[in-house]
Amino acid sequence: MKFTLFSVLVVLLIATFVAADDCPRICTADFRPVCGTPSGGRRSANRTFGNQCSLDSHNCLNKGDTYDKLHDGECK
């Protein structure tokens, strides 16, 4: 009984930490490129992301290095 209760508490604790991170980590492999431009006036080159999900994931995981969608397709 104690082991079962302990196991349930561990699972709930893990689920809480996983739920706190809402960043998409797994994106589909479909190649629908989008061109991103650095947010906030940073002076760096535009960057091509494999798809919108990849751009969103990058922005979520890298708060100080975000990109705005410039247009569909690869950056020129």
Swiss-Prot record:
Q: What is this protein called?
A: Vasotab-TY1
Keywords (A to Z) from UniProt: Calcium channel impairing toxin, Disulfide bond, Ion channel impairing toxin, Secreted, Signal, Toxin, Vasoactive, Vasodilator, Voltage-gated calcium channel impairing toxin
Please describe the organ and tissue distribution of this protein's expression. Expressed by the salivary gland.
Do the record's keywords include Signal? yes
Disulphide-bonded residues: C23-C60, C27-C53, C35-C75
Kazal-like domain location: 22-76
Its lineage reads: Eukaryota, Metazoa, Ecdysozoa, Arthropoda, Hexapoda
Domain of life of the native organism: Eukaryota
Compartments (UniProt record): Secreted
Any Gene Ontology biological process: vasodilation
Report a single Gene Ontology molecular function: calcium channel regulator activity
Please provide one cellular component term from the Gene Ontology annotations of this protein: extracellular region
General function of this protein: Vasodilator protein that inhibits vasoconstriction of isolated rat femoral artery induced by phenylephrine. Since platelet aggregation and vasoconstriction are key hemostatic responses, particularly in small wounds, this protein likely participates in the antihemostatic responses during blood feeding. Blocks L-type calcium channels (Cav1/CACNA1) in left ventricular myocytes isolated from rat hearts.
Which SUPFAM superfamilies does this entry report, sorted A to Z? Kazal-type serine protease inhibitors
Asked if Mitochondrion is a keyword of the record, the answer is: no
Tell me the first and last residues of the signal peptide. 1-21
> What is the native source organism of this protein?
Tabanus yao
> InterPro entries under this entry?
Kazal_dom, Kazal_dom_sf
Q: Which CDD domains match?
A: KAZAL_FS
